[in-house]
Amino acid sequence: MTLGNSYDAFNHDPWMDVVGFEDPNQVTNRDISRIVLYSYMFLNTAKGCLVEYATFRQYMRELPKNAPQKLNFREMRQGLIALGRHCVGSRFETDLYESATSELMANHSVQTGRNIYGVDSFSLTSVSGTTATLLQERASERWIQWLGLESDYHCSFSSTRNAEDVVAGEAASSDHHQKISRVTRKRPREPKSTNDILVAGQKLFGSSFEFRDLHQLRLCYEIYMADTPSVAVQAPPGYGKTELFHLPLIALASKGDVKYVSFLFVPYTVLLANCMIRLGRCGCLNVAPVRNFIEEGYDGVTDLYVGIYDDLASTNFTDRIAAWENIVECTFRTNNVKLGYLIVDEFHNFETEVYRQSQFGGITNLDFDAFEKAIFLSGTAPEAVADAALQRIGLTGLAKKSMDINELKRSEDLSRGLSSYPTRMFNLIKEKSEVPLGHVHKIRKKVESQPEEALKLLLALFESEPESKAIVVASTTNEVEELACSWRKYFRVVWIHGKLDAAEKVSRTKEFVTDGNMRVLIGTKLVTEGIDIKQLMMVIMLDNRLNIIELIQGVGRLRDGGLCYLLSRKNSWAARNRKGELPPIKEGCITEQVREFYGLESKKGKKGQHVGCCGSRTDLSADTVELIERMDRLAEKQATASMSIVALPSNFQESNSSDRYRKYCSSDEDSNTCIHGSANASTNASTNAITTASTNVRTNATTNASTNATTNASTNATTNSSTNATTTASTNVRTSATTTASINVRTSATTTESTNSSTNATTTASINVRTSATTTKSINSSTNATITESTNSNTNATTTESTNSKTSATTTASTNSNTSATTTESTNSKTSATTTASTNSNTSATTTESTNSNTSATTTASTNSSTNATTTESTNASAKEDANKDGNAEDNRFHPVTDINKESYKRKGSQMVLLERKKLKAQFPNTSENMNVLQFLGFRSDEIKHLFLYGIDIYFCPEGVFTQYGLCKGCQKMFELCVCWAGQKVSYRRMAWEALAVERMLRNDEEYKEYLEDIEPYHGDPVGYLKYFSVKRREIYSQIQRNYAWYLAITRRRETISVLDSTRGKQGSQVFRMSGRQIKELYYKVWSNLRESKTEVLQYFLNWDEKKCQEEWEAKDDTVFVEALEKVGVFQRLRSMTSAGLQGPQYVKLQFSRHHRQLRSRYELSLGMHLRDQIALGVTPSKVPHWTAFLSMLIGLFYNKTFRQKLEYLLEQISEVWLLPHWLDLANVEVLAADNTKVPLYMLMVAVHKELDSDDVPDGRFDIILLCRDSSREVGE
């Protein structure tokens, strides 16, 4: 806004809409000035935009939140004038006109200036327009200089002053102000060169690096060299889109004068691990998760942060970017740390992911203009999708005309900023005019059972290519878990879906990508985007709702060719898509649908119509064609051998399936338990009724009568009582003819042949008839004796003859010889000869031996007596996991899986279990991943923040406490008694070990050791322990409040600790009379001595033992450091000598991993301040210990009982803490030394520790009980 008499002389256009006036021509200059002031003169610094005065007043009423009384606008103007006057008085000669100018620019009247600020009557109306402008510009220049921004700005003056406008009386005083300033931004930048990209490529790929094609080269140069602020790229999956920004990022990182910090965002958590591995290889870039940036700020090292869309949309990230320059300037004292690229991968999801669009709303608040360039990448974003996706996040959208890759031009006008400038689209798919994914063989099949067909394909693939990998895309989370548990017996499986927490998704994805032994990744469609897996040769999709984008993304995982199968059930209808979603793919040619999606020219009737689909193999690689041929030959061989693989039933949508399977299929230790009760039950249930019927029919009437008579109440009671954990025993006791038959199903082919050979003709026929699925159905339908006979008679002569011909005396004899004499006699006495023969023949030598050895004569009698149909049925239902375990593992691997009988009590639990589950859910509700036991006790969030329990995991628990294997990981119960509930974020076991940590907070070493003995009945029952813990809930809360009031005062309210307030400290320690400088000098000297002597740090601070460990000082990362400590036995000595033995054996070792991430970040940022302090002290700067050595020091001090007792005696403001996280936080608070200078408490700790080690104890000796150490300097319990 321009003031002065000559305002009318300025050529001002009516560039604004004038509202509130009937005739705009009657609007005066004063009215226009008022409109400008109230509409365009208030700045929102968070967003970097202008706001109206009404909006600004609303902010004034609400902000700042912590101010008890808000300032009004007049008071804010007065504060502005005070700053202006201070600026003029501190840097320039006081000038009446110039002082008044600052006040007038703040909209103060002349009366206000004279009465309040003591200035004579003056207004800018008394001077000419040019002079008024000059005065205002000079005031603005002083303001910029006073704010310290003159290093970022320089003023270039151009002579614009008209002599006629200058009054004579002002000429002498204004000669040196005849130039008007124009403020321009200085951006330090090292010149870029095309050679930078080539050097980056050689760093990443070696000296033989070359671009894929000319399109990739030119586009890479466009991103790095051109000033285009926003670029969108569509390239086919597998093209190398990552290198388009990876190489420019490496080139930016090589610049010495500017540090560029860039951000990459991907749609799903599963892509994080893969992206960080790819982008961090060769050490060319420092890569970190964006969560570190959001929680802790910029660390000064990272080149690229990687996150997901939810991070991009978060308010915390938006605020960090808005305050970037201020934070960097204050933290690093430089303006040479800049925001580089904002990269968004698979950005089409902003438009196509309808169900997530509400989560993307926060992205519109992001200051895109703060970044040097925005890059949007996708393999499935045609112009219409790309334009809508960009507009959805607040950008202008695509430029009207799509740019040709061969017509790259620099933009003429970029002054509007990134957010208002249209995005240039580079469509490499249209440029190349080729249908993507032609290198993949795509097959669409309708099948009876999708899982069955998928399993056949996978087994055939791994037989052809044993080192290959595959991805299976399921439609629901329940289906994912069902398939994982069913297929685990065939190959190693990793499964992922959206209900897993973020850390678990990242961990499992990383495991599949890096572990060469993992074969199959099963998941929902989130596993199909962006992930790059070596050795991937097959993708199978079982989703009927698959749209064209999901299809292209899924097939695109096959980088170097392979097979993609789209399996759908016969007579099934594709589900209706939601509003706004793309429709499912149609029947017919896949290539034609891909062409239509990308807008490519149709080639109907021409050569090349089918590309990798509809049986065409023209565009496939030789390796892919060879794989197809091998798969075809295996399929023919399987068909000839009639090997039917019966997989899971198609009903995967059972509501409670996740209760049983969730999180128990991911680790090797639980692989056996995945072959769970229901699978075994179904195996036994598949022994159809005809076998039992034929067995009973072969028992003569007299035997049946005696059998029924021997089944009494005592036998039933004994059977029921045996249903305990010893499943194997109960299974053996109830072995019947039916069970024997089911055992034979799991026997190798050789054993089956010998079994058949030892059976009479009638029985052999019956068994052979049941070898195929169709025959089994006919047998099940023929349950009476008459039809059984007809079934047997339908067996062709060839089979019977070949079976009989395989009968040898030796096999029969060996089978009978393996049956103990007692058992055989009791069996024969209760059963006819025919039954005995069939029993012996249906049992292989090994199985008969193990069964008989586990059954006494009495048990055998009761077993034989239970041969009626009812008892046989109960035997089948009670078959447990151990029945399968008795068989050969290799035999299990190759034999067919039978249908699962989903018995309600095994899948959903009994009514008592359901009731218990509901009670626990009500008592311990948790829906947040951050839920912890402190919240359950009733602590507020600000208290929980400082009474944190980070670093408390399963390794905190001693061995044997909540660490049983083979049980539910969430509640440590048997699977059929599991009380975990679907959607539970925090397991009962985790809450139990946190409750144990809370109890540790309140007990010293001896008391805690006794407590562990008292709760011994709960060592295997975390749920029972939680109930026991909850009874004392109020008492524990009150006790923590009392015992840790001092701790919360120091850490939460930051109350200052002064050594002069400690009477015992001043009287008994020289350290408490030292200045802050002396304490720091002593601290640096101790570390200098340790470094020179290569002393092992943890052992030294634990008991002053100066053992050498050179490997520790030479270690470059945390892993090598821990290995060095373990090699010299530090952790073992720590557990044997201190209270560390009350935790798990890995607890201390794991403290060096990621447990103390936030504390580590704070410490590493403080290293620069320590260096400045040393220089200020006038001493030669010494190396400050790196993080691992610093943490070793604090851990050693924590477990040094003698030192702890002395420190607590001397420093009266602190008391005992018994958890390592609390000790670490306490050690970083600041204390006032004797001269009132601040030093970190850990420096004071080292000084006290050094004083204890000194032979010359300073005046004022301590209590002998606290200070004496034995001659060996070992720390006792």
From Swiss-Prot:
Database matches in InterPro entries: DEAD/DEAH_box_helicase_dom (IPR011545), Helicase_ATP-bd (IPR014001), Helicase_C-like (IPR001650), P-loop_NTPase (IPR027417), RLR_Helicase (IPR051363)
Biased amino acid composition, Low complexity: 775-878
A GO CC term attached to the entry: cytoplasm
Motif (DEAH box): 345-348
Bias kind Basic and acidic residues: ranges: 879-895
Any one GO MF annotation of this record: ATP binding
Function field: Catalyzes DNA unwinding and is involved in telomerase-independent telomere maintenance.
Family note: Belongs to the helicase family. Yeast subtelomeric Y' repeat subfamily.
Name recorded for this polypeptide: Y' element ATP-dependent helicase YEL077C
Organism, as annotated: Saccharomyces cerevisiae (strain ATCC 204508 / S288c) (Baker's yeast)
